[in-house]
Structure formats: structure tokens, C-alpha cells
Regions:
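Mature catalytic domains of secreted/periplasmic carbohydrate-active enzymes
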Residues: 1-177
């Protein structure tokens, strides 16, 4: 979206532009919920940009609105921050959202905190391949056995496993994927 910015808006013009993006985001989410009333939830990503961190009041109110419109809606911990910029868990240690989305390209080492919590592990086939990567030379690529091991381990800890694929602009997959 051309109105999105990673840094926090500073000028009146930037704030106006980013507010346009926030309105667009809200309308898109509401449209999805209207068009797909049987949907179960949203999977979000990107709570590290300063613009989103500073929008904690917007995201708090939007989450509240989405839940009022669709009781039982499942929202992951990457949707919003608290007012102090804390992600996944607020400043009081409470999880933001319905399940923990902090396991990106890695699995939990200490599993004691998982007891009774829903979580997911988001994995790429190359080390950091979000989206299409033309050149994979010199990169370790996870094997089928690696992926199956991660899937089985995630499930053994009652986690969900999300595997990212990066097709090119024509929808074709890299041979290694």
C-alpha cells in the first residue's frame, strides 16, 4: 500500500497519509469478515515497524471492533503492541491475542511456558526466504527430512506449523521448494 510507512509519521502530511493506510486496513479487514462470515481468524505479521508500534490505540480499538463483530474470532499475537511497544506479551506478561506467534524460523528451546498455550512456528525453506528469492546459492536449504522433523516437533508440543513458500511473479516455485 503506498500509504504505509515503516517509520513513525512525523509531519502532518505523513500522519494524514498513514491515517489513510489505517482506514484502508480497517476497511479491508471488515470487508473480509463481511464476505467470509464463517472465517475463524486472522494471521498477522509486522508489529516491529515504528508506525505500527505507535498505532497501539488504533490496533487496540480495531481488535475490539473485530471481536464485537465476530465473537470467537482468533487473532494471533502479531496484530498489535501495547502502549509501551511490547510485542506478543504486554508489559504485564499477558499474551496479546489468542495464540503466540513469536516462533519464526526457530522452535522454542524452553518448552515449560507452552503448557496450555496455543502457538505457531513459522518456517521458511531457505534461512530467511520470505517471498521469492531468485538466488539461493550459498544458502542452506532445509531438506524434506528437516521440514518433517520440525512439523512433528511442533505438533508434539501442540503447536501449529506454518510453512512459507515464495513463488515468483508468475506463481512458479523455486526448484528447492
Amino acid at each position: 500500500n503506498p500509504d504505509y510507512m515503516g517509520k513513525a509519521p512525523q509531519t502532518a502530511e505523513e500522519k494524514k497519509k498513514f491515517d489513510k493506510f489505517l482506514k484502508y486496513t480497517r476497511n479491508q479487514l471488515l470487508e473480509l469478515m463481511n464476505n467470509y462470515p464463517q472465517m475463524k481468524g486472522f494471521w498477522f505479521d509486522g508489529t516491529w515497524d515504528q508506525s505500527w508500534i505507535k498505532s497501539y490505540e488504533f490496533t487496540y480499538n480495531l481488535e475490539k471492533e473485530l471481536r464485537e463483530k465476530h465473537p470467537g474470532l482468533i487473532i494471533g499475537s502479531r496484530f498489535r503492541n501495547d502502549e509501551f511497544g511490547k510485542r506478543h506479551f504486554d508489559s504485564n506478561g499477558r499474551m496479546l491475542g489468542d495464540y503466540e506467534q513469536g516462533w519464526e524460523r526457530k522452535l522454542p528451546g524452553d518448552i515449560s511456558w507452552l503448557e496450555g498455550r496455543d502457538w505457531d512456528c513459522v518456517m521458511t525453506i531457505p534461512p530467511n526466504g520470505w517471498g521469492y528469492m531468485k538466488d539461493w546459492s550459498g544458502l542452506y536449504t532445509k531438506t524434506t527430512d528437516d521440514i518433517i522433523d520440525i512439523l512433528v516437533y511442533s505438533r508434539s508440543l501442540n503447536g501449529n506449523f506454518v510453512l512459507n513458500f515464495g513463488p515468483d511473479g508468475q506463481g512458479k516455485m523455486h526448484p528447492e521448494e
